[in-house]
């Protein structure tokens, strides 16, 4: 189903009905520009239970995206030919299409905005999409990548302009430096694979949060739990860990809290949200061990909330995503100046020392 009144109209294409269910939080993911559209396609391939929206100035790029809703912005500014890497044109295109952008983020409880910073459309439009989502009353979370260093100073400076514009427009801002991906890439990783990794880390950031609300699990969270950590949180950090074998829980948790994606430690964070994804073979002791490690790495007074998501394809494995928030309005650069990464090898905590981790009563009673 397509809607178009004239050649000058903004194009909104509905490709399929949203698969949202009654009684669930209304979650939307908006991919801005080429990188955001690529991330949306990766999320769709992983069957995330959210509504997907693609925003672009480039009509051809939109046609390749598999999003539920596609919004072509800035027809007068770009004539459907893209922003040419100029973030101010991307911003002007989004400004021209405020009405359309406001319409697609209405009736949302949570809106994720994702893009690869440094280009024209994604960098320029993201802050305006965020502004529209906040005005609609949604919990607004930005998940973005910063360009690789080899992409040059201009692209990196452009990214900083986009990130600066986003501060104050989102509840939580997660920025992952692509250069950090080099620390987990092998010497044989191709350039194409590196950019795919950058797209996929955007997917992991969104999925790590949204799955806690939308996916069935041993320990489920609701929207209010996520909102308690993410609302007005400012800049946030994300770490991802994976483990297999006998020490999988410990390995995954340690990787997550000392992840190469983290530009600093999670010391000083006032809120921690973490997702444990595993098959049905996960044990109570493994959940407790993972929680202990995250708790030991966090601020003593941090509000820590977690959920356990079941994924039957992960038998024998555990993946942990940690989101740390509440750094008192500090930027990541300021946080790096105040804290150094610390060793995670801590004494094991007993259950009584986990009192400030939000463990559901039914599970606490079983421990």
How does the language model describe each region?
Residues 2-367:
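Tubulin/FtsZ superfamily GTPase core signature
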């Amino acid at each position: 189903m397509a809607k178009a009144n004239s050649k000058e109209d903004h194009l909104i294409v509905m490709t399929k009905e949203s698969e949202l269910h009654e009684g669930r939080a209304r979650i939307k993911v908006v991919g801005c520009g080429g990188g955001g559209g690529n991330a949306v396609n990766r999320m769709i391939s992983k069957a995330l239970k959210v509504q997907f929206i693609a925003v672009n100035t480039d009509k051809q790029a939109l046609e390749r995206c598999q999003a539920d809703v596609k919004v072509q912005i800035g027809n007068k500014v770009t004539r459907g030919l893209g922003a040419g890497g100029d973030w101010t044109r991307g911003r002007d295109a989004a400004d021209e299409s405020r009405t359309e952008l406001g319409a697609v983020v209405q009736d949302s409880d949570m809106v994720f905005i994702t893009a690869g910073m440094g280009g024209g459309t994604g960098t320029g439009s993201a802050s305006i999409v965020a502004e529209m989502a906040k005005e609609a009353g949604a919990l607004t979370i930005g998940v973005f990548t910063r360009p690789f260093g080899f992409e040059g100073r201009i692209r990196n400076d452009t990214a900083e302009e986009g990130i600066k514009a986003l501060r104050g427009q989102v509840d939580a801002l997660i920025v992952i430096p692509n250069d950090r991906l080099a620390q987990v890439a092998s010497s044989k990783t191709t350039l194409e694979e590196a950019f795919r990794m950058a797209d996929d880390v955007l997917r992991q950031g969104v999925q790590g949060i949204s799955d806690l609300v939308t996916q069935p699990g041993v320990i489920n969270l609701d929207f209010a739990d996520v909102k308690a950590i993410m609302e007005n949180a400012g800049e946030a950090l994300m770490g991802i860990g994976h483990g297999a074998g006998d020490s999988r829980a410990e390995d995954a948790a340690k990787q997550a809290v000392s992840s190469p994606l983290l530009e600093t430690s999670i010391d000083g964070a006032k809120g921690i949200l973490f997702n444990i994804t595993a098959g049905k073979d996960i044990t109570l002791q493994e959940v407790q061990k993972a929680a202990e490690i995250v708790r030991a790495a966090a601020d003593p007074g941090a509000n820590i909330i977690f959920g356990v998501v079941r994924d039957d394809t992960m038998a024998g494995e555990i993946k942990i995503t940690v989101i740390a928030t509440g750094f008192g309005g500090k930027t990541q650069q300021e946080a790096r100046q105040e804290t150094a990464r610390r060793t995670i090898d801590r004494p094991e905590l007993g259950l009584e020392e986990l009192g400030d981790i939000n463990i559901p009563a039914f599970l606490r009673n079983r421990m």
